[in-house]
Curated annotation (Swiss-Prot):
SUPFAM superfamilies for this protein: Eukaryotic type KH-domain (KH-domain type I)
InterPro entries named in the record: KH-I_PNO1_first, KH_dom, KH_dom_type_1_sf, KH_PNO1_2nd, KRR1-like_KH1
Native source organism of the sequence: Debaryomyces hansenii (strain ATCC 36239 / CBS 767 / BCRC 21394 / JCM 1990 / NBRC 0083 / IGC 2968) (Yeast)
Region feature (Disordered): 1-71
Record has RNA-binding as a keyword: yes
Record's protein name: Pre-rRNA-processing protein PNO1
Residue ranges of domain KH in the record: 176-228
Amino acid sequence: MAAPTAIKDLPESKDVEAVSNEGIEGEEEMLIDAGSVPQENEEGASKKKESSEMVLDESGKPKFSAASKSGMKVKLESRKVPVPPHRMTPLKNTWTKIYPPLVDHLKLQVRMNLKTKTIEMKTNKNTVDQGALQKGADFVKAFTLGFDVDDAIALLRLDDLYIETFEVKDVKTLNGDHLSRAIGRIAGKDGKTKFAIENATRTRIVLADSKIHILGGFTHIRMAREAVVSLILGSPPGKVYGNLRTVASRMKERY
């Protein structure tokens, strides 16, 4: 029996080396296959690993990075907004103020079609915002309803602005002189009552015959609508002014 410290025979060591070499060759083949994968996938996987790690802010809430818009593509769509006949002349006069926000801010293609009396808007490769077409349509619609261009531009800059439309007959059925008096109470002498409601509630109001359009935030529209409805129902302007003062003081405290 050989001693435990005796040197092993050379043939046995060759067999061991052959087995180890076969294993190494097999590993090299697997490495070549893994190297054939594009580097972009590896980078994407590393990014996923980094993104999977949750980052917490000071209060302990998870903090997520903003979604990148580089990979987002806007569909090529078009929209036509009809223009009423009585708004065509104001549209032509203020066209130089209307199209720059649509072209420069929203990156839309705009055309005024005089034959069909519509404003046509299209998205293109430069358009970034997916809601640009809808914002542009709302802006043009606000102008066609009778709002000033400077007031309608606020729809492009702020997301929480809306337009609410209702008629006098939705509140109370009035005809003839009664309807005229109700509209006169809303406007007031030289528009004094209408301006008071606008300033107190931070809204813009358009009186188009028996239709009333209100532009503003959700809560502001509700306050302005309550004042207009009370005038239609016959409340004296003095009482409405008192309520508006209360509303204005509350809004100053809130904001």
